[in-house]
């Protein structure tokens, strides 16, 4: 409760809290790795973080202070230790070289992308002549988001978390849903957005599409509320450029106007999600050097907060 009060104490008359109205929790579900972006159970809490009862208490405390909670939602891939992948792998290892999988025997084969050919982005399935798509690494097999069975699973999973009080979702690795196929990604984002908002119309969804602005802007046509605006982030982004003397205030303003015009062309109700740095980037304290570094960092954070949309810290 003490740390929540630092974020937002729920009292508008005080000025000792940050006044934030939303918390984004990075992956909290069971996982064999430190980062937990490879989930083994989508409907539980990793013991390192506590229990479901702890989570429910957190939600209640946050809501009492006017803080919304969104959770990281990793549906591009699961862990290779997830029961879905284990079942599919074990089944494929039983097949003869000329035998095709029977989805009635093992429906989980359709949950992932398997092939007997070594395709780009695929890795060998040990003990078999099969390969599976794993764009990040072999411990993160890519899920088949076109599969109706997979979509049904995520329908149930999102319902579970909404029933536990979450206010929305942060979608991880959006550009990897269908590598090199932006129209297919937009379709999958549309499905997810419509599915979630049919259950909670005011749910907030923000996507991570780590690419240039022109490439991810069309994803706004899906109805997803926000996408992180990478053009302003990191040590070489539009915010840092100004403070390094590589651009003017007019350039910064025009960049925002250009972004707003572009995003609105795909979704008039879009909400930009500007940020300065995140867990995948270097710490912002190292973006500057010299006696003005602290002041430059403060200015940068102020610029981020004053941008249009939902600013993430």
Question: Across the structure, where does each feature detected by a protein language model lie?
Answer:
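Short, charged, surface-exposed secondary-structure boundary motifs
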Residues: 236-243
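A Trp-anchored, charged/polar loop motif used as the substrate-binding/catalytic surface
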Residues: 1, 148-157, 248-261
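Hydrophobic residues within beta-strands of alpha/beta enzymes
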Residues: 23-25, 169-171, 312
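Catalytic-core region of carbohydrate-active enzymes that cleave or remodel glycosidic bonds
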Residues: 190-205, 244-313
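Active-site groove signature of glycoside hydrolases
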Residues: 75-77, 155-180, 269-281
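Acidic/aromatic-lined carbohydrate-recognition and catalytic surfaces
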Residues: 1-152, 163, 174-222, 227, ...
């Amino acid at each position: 409760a003490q740390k929540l009060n630092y974020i937002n104490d729920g009292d508008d008359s005080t000025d000792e809290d940050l006044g934030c109205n939303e918390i984004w929790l990075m992956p909290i579900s069971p996982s064999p790795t430190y980062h937990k972006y490879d989930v083994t159970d989508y409907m539980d809490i990793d013991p390192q973080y506590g229990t479901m009862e702890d989570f429910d208490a957190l939600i209640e405390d946050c809501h009492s202070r006017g803080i919304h909670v969104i959770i990281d939602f990793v549906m591009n891939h699961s862990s290779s230790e997830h029961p879905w992948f284990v079942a599919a792998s074990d089944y494929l290892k039983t097949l003869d070289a000329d035998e095709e999988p029977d989805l009635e025997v093992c429906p989980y084969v359709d949950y992932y992308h398997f092939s007997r050919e070594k395709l780009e982005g695929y890795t060998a399935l040990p003990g078999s002549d099969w390969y599976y798509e794993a764009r990040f690494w072999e411990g993160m097999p890519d899920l088949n988001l076109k599969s109706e069975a997979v979509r049904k699973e995520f329908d149930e999973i999102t319902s579970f978390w909404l029933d536990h009080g979450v206010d929305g979702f942060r979608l991880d690795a959006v550009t990897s849903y269908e590598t090199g196929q932006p129209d297919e990604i937009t379709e999958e984002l549309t499905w997810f957005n419509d599915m979630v908002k049919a259950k909670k119309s005011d749910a907030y969804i923000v996507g991570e599409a780590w690419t240039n602005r022109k490439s991810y802007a069309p994803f706004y046509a899906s109805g997803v509320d926000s996408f992180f605006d990478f053009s302003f982030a990191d040590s070489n982004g539009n915010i840092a450029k100004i403070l390094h003397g590589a651009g003017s205030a007019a350039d910064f303003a025009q960049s925002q106007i250009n972004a707003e015009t572009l995003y609105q062309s795909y979704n008039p109700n879009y909400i930009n999600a500007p940020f300065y740095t995140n867990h995948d980037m270097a710490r912002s304290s190292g973006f500057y050097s010299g006696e003005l570094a602290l002041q430059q960092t403060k200015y940068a954070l102020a610029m981020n907060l004053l941008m249009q949309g939902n600013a993430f810290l």
